[in-house]
């Protein structure tokens, strides 16, 4: 029910690809809260590419965790987007409202994008509507290139 509400909520928002690049590590849901997995996607980018907010929201964290820089944006009461491995803009502050497409920082050679609904990680590209079957390649239109399944 919560996930359905969040999908409905996102359907009224406009979404942009946060960064251009190739998905080099796919989402792998963990079997349990502390189990191994990859709770987002990793996108290979060009260093210093601009990383933008996928959806309008509020910045709730800007800082480092274990030496890696992160920006976390709350887009609804229970949904957060995490942008990792970026150099946040100096002007970005906790509590700041950001618009969809607004620059958050600069990419390193890779950028991590994760989405959580409550405490549960969900596939960020599918959740944000940036992946899925299309008659026209959305990856070129949206700036995200997916790797082929093997």
Each predicted region: which residue ranges?
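Surface-exposed, glycine-biased beta-strand/turn segments
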Residues: 3-70, 99-100, 122-126, 130-150
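Short hydrophobic beta/alpha edge segments that flank linear recognition/processing sites
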Residues: 43, 70-73, 98-113
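Short, solvent-exposed loop/turn positions at domain surfaces
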Residues: 45-47, 86, 92
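Acidic, glycine-anchored pre-beta loop/turn
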Residues: 62, 89-98, 102, 119
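Short acidic/polar mixed-charge low-complexity motifs
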Residues: 49, 77-80, 120
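Zn2+-dependent peptidoglycan hydrolase active-site motif and core
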Residues: 54-88, 110-112
């Amino acid at each position: 029910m919560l996930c359905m509400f969040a999908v409905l909520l996102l359907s009224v928002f406009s979404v942009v690809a946060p960064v251009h690049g190739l998905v080099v590590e796919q989402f792998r849901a963990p079997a349990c809260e502390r189990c191994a997995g990859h709770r987002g996607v990793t996108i290979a980018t060009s260093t210093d590419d601009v990383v933008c907010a996928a959806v309008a929201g509020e910045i709730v964290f800007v800082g480092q965790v274990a030496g890696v820089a992160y920006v976390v944006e709350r887009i609804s009461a229970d949904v957060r987007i995490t942008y990792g491995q970026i150099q946040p803009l100096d002007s970005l502050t906790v509590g700041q409202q950001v618009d969809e497409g607004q620059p958050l920082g600069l990419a390193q050679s890779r950028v991590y994008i994760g989405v959580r609904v409550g405490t549960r990680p969900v596939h960020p590209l599918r959740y944000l509507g940036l992946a899925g079957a299309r008659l026209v390649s959305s990856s070129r239109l949206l700036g995200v290139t997916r790797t082929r399944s093997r």
